[in-house]
Amino acid sequence: MSKKLYLIIRIKGEPDAHPDVRKTLENLRLLRRYAAVVYPADLPGLEGMLRKAQAWITWGEIRKDVLAKLLEVRGRAPGDKKLTPEYIKEKFGVNSFEELAEKIINGEVVLHKQEAIKPFFRLHPPRGGFKKSIKKPYRSGGEAGYRGEAINELVLRML
């Protein structure tokens, strides 16, 4: 049984953000621009937080192959150590990042509750830049807000 997972990326800073929005971004663990987190879509309260911060973030459903690449390239262990195949074998009993991504998607490993992996990923700005305005919603020709499967192409440009 695979669960729907949201990859949430912060795309704007916060100088003019309302205090409620700042607190929401903090609760989502999106403390800096280009930080990303992965949460199950059915997490209680997540929809409200996404709606409140939608002008500062973009999100969508992540694919298994993209999650595996994100863990391999940008995943960090406590102490800011890079994730290695030996480390994930010791902590999770899996042989590859693809197997770990499969366990996360199936709900056997809950990424935001893990102590063995940092709960956020620090990304680069997208290669080639944002194609549209970060001030407008995605459905209106911008970059912010819900974007569905298109989040995968964006995050691959940010690794």
Curated annotation (Swiss-Prot):
GO biological process, one term: translation
Gene Ontology MF annotations: RNA binding; structural constituent of ribosome
Disulfide bonds: none
Domain of life: Archaea
Keywords associated with the record: Ribonucleoprotein, Ribosomal protein
Family: Belongs to the universal ribosomal protein uL30 family.
Description of how the protein assembles with itself and partners: Part of the 50S ribosomal subunit.
PANTHER family given in the database record: 60S RIBOSOMAL PROTEIN L7, LARGE RIBOSOMAL SUBUNIT PROTEIN UL30
Protein name (Swiss-Prot/TrEMBL): Large ribosomal subunit protein uL30
Species name: Ignicoccus hospitalis (strain KIN4/I / DSM 18386 / JCM 14125)
Lineage, broadest ranks: Archaea, Thermoproteota, Thermoprotei, Desulfurococcales, Desulfurococcaceae
